């Protein structure tokens, strides 16, 4: 193509993504758009076409990004090229959302006509506004009997501050309003700006590993053109590769001759390691590099850590390979080897949040068939030592001695909770129980309230989300963002079994709730650890001071059974002999800790009702 043709084509490109809270109909709307533009035949259509991972379809959530190229013949007779970039809606994947938004010029904001705006919608809308996108509000599910489009329209204006007077009323399920949305995309969303003759700049917004072609990078071309045979360079690492193939998605991959300004597609360049295609990085031409990379690339820092150990220690290498393979598609997953006396060899893994952690665990078990033991999740604490140095601790077993610690700081998050006003009381109680500080409260309308709290991340990591859902009968929605570190009165608690520390059960807890927490855990472990031939004390200790204890009683044979009548001294002799034996066993005996015990530590609800 010459310059004229490229520019003409560029004017007809529209790049957009769809923002919505879970279950507001985003994937269904994407299906309808695919159908309307003829990207898929009736036969190929299935629910949630873009959610390709089995897990995504099962949970009904979008985890990875997907991009599709569509052609749409508008009412003005022109044929437009649409790139729909599907984004995850969940808070753990905020970075995925922000990069997919960076690859667009516009976003469709889908809001459920019955439920109104939810916490995650807000978070993603603000990301879109930060990326200067044109936002088209769509009120979905208007076919529901409980739909109140006018109330929702008002809410969009009041809460987000968007003009929703011309919001499209639609129902993706029934197919109402889809044409109108497509026309609005043509009319409202700007064409990509960029120069096809400038040095190449392409944003990597995702990457995936293909065993035959190496890494496939998903890119959005911002300036310049890329074609096979060209040498390219990654701007954050400076590594160079030669492009072997470029193409677009029509959901399936389709090879094309070149990708130019505004195109969303993929390229392969015999890249062996996915670490070389960092998400958010800029690809440029090796011979004629761009002066500076595209903004918005940042290295992802994991927020939540946990240990993962194979139940069968022989599969340690399989686990490493599995984690490496998952890391190919998931730039946010971090892991490094660690050992534990109780669990043997395993890995310390870092995740973006709890959902991310659960999904990785599930994928390891499903796709790689590795049975895992996972330890309690923890966050990164900043520990200031008395000699003036500062260390980051993400594993409770690495916590320095209490004598050396000057103060410990922990990460705090700003939690935005949307809740029906009947449940404001229980939710505020929950947040205070989790050491939250009240920041703000706004009534969105007569039925719903937005609460803002600053809460330590470590409290959210446990079971905050479940507790929130059960306290509000599932009506609350919740979103959080990191706001920084604050000093807290924290201590490390160890669990001792038969006088030995079980390193995998150590955790860090606030001093005020240490006693209750310790008591609850030893009681729980007493029920979960199978009884041994000897008596086993279970203790919770802070430093050298034991603060809670319970005892797992010994299993014992009735040695007096064969005595019938008999002299008391004979009975006493047998009992003493049994006692001696138990004592000897206790000295050399070791206790097996079942998998449930590690999970129980996470599930303990500190607020004993």
Swiss-Prot record:
The protein's Enzyme Commission number: 3.6.5.n1
Protein's cellular compartments: Cell membrane
InterPro entries: EF-4, EFG_III/V, EFG_V-like, EFTu-like_2, G_TR_CS, LepA_C_sf, LepA_CTD, LepA_IV
CDD domains the UniProt entry points to: EF4_II, EF4_III, LepA, lepA_C
Gene3D superfamilies the UniProt entry points to: 3.30.70.240, Elongation factor 4, C-terminal domain, Elongation Factor G (Translational Gtpase), domain 3, P-loop containing nucleotide triphosphate hydrolases, Translation factors
UniProt enzyme class: hydrolase
One term of GO molecular function: GTP binding
Membrane-related topology note: Peripheral membrane protein
Assigned protein family: Belongs to the TRAFAC class translation factor GTPase superfamily. Classic translation factor GTPase family. LepA subfamily.
Record NCBIfam families: lepA, small_GTP
Protein name: Elongation factor 4
Organism: Geobacillus kaustophilus (strain HTA426)
Gene: lepA
